[in-house]
Curated annotation (Swiss-Prot):
This is Large ribosomal subunit protein uL18. GO terms for molecular function: 5S rRNA binding; structural constituent of ribosome. GO terms for biological process: translation. CDD domains: Ribosomal_L18_L5e (cd00432). Signal peptide: none annotated. One of its GO terms (cellular component) is cytosolic large ribosomal subunit. This is one of the proteins that bind and probably mediate the attachment of the 5S RNA into the large ribosomal subunit, where it forms part of the central protuberance. Part of the 50S ribosomal subunit; part of the 5S rRNA/L5/L18/L25 subcomplex. Contacts the 5S and 23S rRNAs. SUPFAM superfamilies: Translational machinery components. It comes from the Bacteria. The keyword rRNA-binding applies.
């Protein structure tokens, strides 16, 4: 029973992800910021969909932070620094099918606080 529930949740998240990706895309000056959340850490990257290139990425494991709100704020601050070095000040936020609540919302708000317009 539990396996079916987890499989259904994953299936629904992937459907949301595809629906979102059909509507948004990024370019070099206005990249798509994609978030992946695992049980232990967060991954965030800026993607140019026109050239299919990752412009910048931050891995939560390398920073030694957990996948909670405090960790999301630290990752977002580091990612904002990386984007500012590359002179990227605005982007499209791709929540990757996750609900905009908790860790994902904290990450987006921290990016905004650090000067990235989403």
């Amino acid at each position: 029973m539990r396996a079916n529930v987890l499989k259904r949740k994953l299936t629904l998240r992937i459907k949301r992800k595809k629906r979102i990706r059909a509507k948004i895309s990024g370019c070099e000056n206005f990249p798509r910021i994609s978030v992946f959340k695992s049980n232990r850490t967060l991954y965030i990257q800026a993607i140019d969909d026109v050239k299919a290139v990752t412009l910048a990425a931050v891995d939560g494991r390398k920073l030694g932070v957990k996948a909670n709100k405090e960790g999301a704020k630290k990752i977002a601050a580091e990612f904002a620094k990386t984007l500012k070095v590359k002179k990227i000040e605005q982007a499209v936020f791709d929540r990757n099918g996750y609900v905009y609540h908790g860790v994902i919302a904290a990450l987006a708000e921290s990016l905004r606080e650090n000067g990235i317009r989403l």
